């Protein structure tokens, strides 16, 4: 099974990029198994390295469904990162962030 995570942006960087002081991101990973958690942790590490002032939250799909974080925070789906296309997907996500002015 190929694991993936979905990346969302929320907060001022996505509501009003000119007033933003940080970039709030949410990583939603598929489950609580080791491989899913490791992929989410690696994504968080790489995103934190490449995005200045990033604040990154991680939730499993079940946790996100329980808390309704995406809806409550009015989070914007930015893309997905698949473990077998990690670098390509990370580059695509970076492009999306640049286009939105969140970088």
Residue ranges of model-derived segments:
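Catalytic core of pol beta-like nucleotidyltransferases
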Residues: 1-10, 14-20, 29-103
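Short beta-strand->loop micro-motif that forms the acidic, two-metal-ion catalytic signature
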Residues: 25-27
């Amino acid at each position: 099974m190929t694991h993936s995570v979905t990346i969302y942006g929320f907060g001022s960087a996505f509501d009003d990029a000119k007033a933003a002081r940080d970039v709030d991101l949410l990583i939603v990973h598929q489950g609580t198994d080791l491989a899913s958690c490791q992929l989410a942790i690696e994504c968080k590490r790489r995103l934190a390295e490449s995005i200045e002032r990033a604040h990154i939250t991680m939730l499993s799909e079940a946790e996100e469904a329980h808390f309704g974080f995406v809806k409550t925070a009015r989070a914007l789906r930015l893309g997905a990162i698949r473990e077998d296309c990690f670098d390509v997907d990370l580059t695509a996500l970076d492009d999306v962030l640049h286009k939105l002015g969140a970088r």
